[in-house]
């Protein structure tokens, strides 16, 4: 949100060192070969084609030669202006005539100059030349016939340069807080080791989803709305005035310093004849924005392919807007809402031609750009000057780099993250926006009246181009006042010069110095994001060989490439924890500053319910609760996008990779969980459970190493909620799912060692529990049967590694060739006849049970039986000396409390408090949740401190 800062000076103030007036009355002369043609266009005149025009303006002891060419590319072919209210009429004919008005170009063949003017009703617009900005417009008392004659037609040319002498301190004109959000941190992270941007492209029709790290043209289809106050103030010139503002904003977005090819395209202009037909506009800027966003959403077309569909909407009003703390507000918009039909909109308080800069600034917020003075921008790019578009105190635009490096980096990440995919379709009928500088259409006097009201005049002795000082009254006295905006581009500032972006510059030929950009060589690959387990290295190239200039095309194609590195497994991978789990655990003890969570909170990854766009954010759930948060804007490069996928995250985007960890590899896991395998190293185990008893019923024990697990419970006769529910326990007998007669109705992710099981929830006709990757711990599947005891139908299948000496000829099989498991007991219906020479009896030991304690010294037990060859028990037949152990010691050291140093006292005198970090550390130094340590022995974490008396 832009805020307005008005400085007031006495009328007699004169800039120190200024010896020449800051405006002159001039007569533009057309100097191109077709000197017999029309010199200015009027509505209804014939089109002169795409020929170039040259105008000479002599002022300020120099000649300005404006080399102009038609430029209406910011108007969609289907552009139309429509009145809503009384009278109701379409003005398409007038809109078509306006396409011929707008020209753009350069001054005196100067590469850094700039001109954007309208030739309708005289020369009106702005241009910049050698550090000064010029605004030109016909004198108000000049008749239309005079303005059409070859060498007649008085115009007012105003020059604005750097401000000299006393001036008011500019205040922020934008109410958007100069803070940061996770998206900004993510956007700037790649730039921390360097302070350069990335490249982009030129125009070409595209559609669909954008590729990551690729420069692609974007087309911002725009609705422009003017309320009743604008209609009354501007009258018949309103449409031309609005398009002049949008033409200036569009040219700013085509500047290469934004590092992206952004094309502002107006698809429709709505002029509201009375207040009842439009949104409710009040002095409350935030409320007006909300009203306008809701109103424009109802008018927009459903399909992006419709010629009049818009991606963003802009409301212009003369209403004095007020922000939260001041009524100096000039504009307001939500941050990062481009392509959101409900919120991609902005509100602009019209204060004359400088509103073009307000429009570009607020649209920058819609593109997720913060102010340049936010801390994260300064940390990466250093302290930025206050003359870029996203400065909160916009005064004078840097003509060479209107967009800061921070703004370019953030909009690049915003578009690369898929937030600008609605901008990929090129309008079928764009409205042509004026390319003439606004100073050629609006005189200094007109600029003052637009900014400060009827009767306001330019103050004498203004410094050229920098700030527009206009007369006004304060406490009955005549004063000079400014809103810290420069003169409009195109205002003359001397002989052969005009104002451009706050500087007085020479005129030049636009086409002679046009330079298309080209890619430079690839920079070296950076460091690997991980030391083991599969990291990523990045390399970039810049559009700097050469850098596009003077309207030249930007580079198109891939600007960032990547490769895998350090693929060897990490030593800690044997624990079964994923890299994402480790990143979540790093936040253990952080309660997100909410009283809903304790400082003993432990964080685990959240997978279910996460949109594909957010897979590479570090979204973690507080273990044992339903609360989840984005703890980091992106995971470390090389982190798996999902636990059942081999794709990895690169700069916050999910990129395809093979199971070998290599980006671009096509290797896949087979059903056995073997990378690049042929499905021959494992066997399939299937089974069916249909006869339950009330309560929990054992279904199957799934050993460690099982992969491609698929368990389904079909509702009785297709019913949802047939009172049968899947349950899951770990090897310690702890329920991981639907235990203690409490079931989960929603989708859940169950994190186990080595894998994640996806649970469908109970709200489906087919309740499912699935995992693709091998599990590294045994699990037990049960079914909870309650209520009417309708028969369940639980089918399960999974794959187990084959034993090295397994003999397939003696393996029982079902008719389909797969071993069949009935409640974890192999079917022996097809058992092969046993030979007569049976082996002797042997000891058979079961699996070790859980440890009797969770930590410390405990015992484990197991069953040991003597079995003869038919499987019958008979302890006397076995050798007692070789009997296996039935008990053994177990237990790891208990977690301990680890203390840090006390913090300084919270007060410098009197009674305050101090605190020290406290962590629960397990065996091997692993950070645990606090509830896993002995809370009865928890050391004091917070204490009072008393210093000297105050």
UniProtKB/Swiss-Prot annotation:
The record marks 212-213 as: Cleavage. This is A disintegrin and metalloproteinase with thrombospondin motifs 15. Residues 428-515 form the Disintegrin domain. The active site is at 362. Zn(2+) binds at residues 174, 361, 365, 371. Keywords: Cleavage on pair of basic residues, Disulfide bond, Extracellular matrix, Glycoprotein, Hydrolase, Metal-binding, Metalloprotease, Protease, Repeat, Secreted, Signal, Zinc, Zymogen. The precursor is cleaved by a furin endopeptidase. Glycosylated. Can be O-fucosylated by POFUT2 on a serine or a threonine residue found within the consensus sequence C1-X(2)-(S/T)-C2-G of the TSP type-1 repeat domains where C1 and C2 are the first and second cysteine residue of the repeat, respectively. Fucosylated repeats can then be further glycosylated by the addition of a beta-1,3-glucose residue by the glucosyltransferase, B3GALTL. Fucosylation mediates the efficient secretion of ADAMTS family members. Can be C-glycosylated with one or two mannose molecules on tryptophan residues within the consensus sequence W-X-X-W of the TPRs. The spacer domain and the TSP type-1 domains are important for a tight interaction with the extracellular matrix. The conserved cysteine present in the cysteine-switch motif binds the catalytic zinc ion, thus inhibiting the enzyme. The dissociation of the cysteine from the zinc ion upon the activation-peptide release activates the enzyme. A motif (Cysteine switch) lies at residues 172-179. Gene3D superfamilies: 2.60.120.830, 3.40.1620.60, Collagenase (Catalytic Domain), Thrombospondin type-1 (TSP1) repeat. Its EC number is 3.4.24.-. InterPro entries: ADAM_Cys-rich, ADAMTS/ADAMTS-like, ADAMTS_ADAMTS-like, ADAMTS_CR_2, ADAMTS_CR_3, ADAMTS_spacer1, MetalloPept_cat_dom_sf, Pept_M12B_ADAM-TS8. Residues 701-838 are annotated as: Spacer. GO terms for cellular component: cell surface; extracellular space. It comes from Mus musculus (Mouse). Its main location: secreted. It is found in: Secreted, Extracellular space, Extracellular matrix; Cell surface. SMART domains: ACR (SM00608), TSP1 (SM00209). Residues 802-816 have a biased composition (Basic and acidic residues). Residues 516-571, 839-895, 896-949 form the TSP type-1 domain.
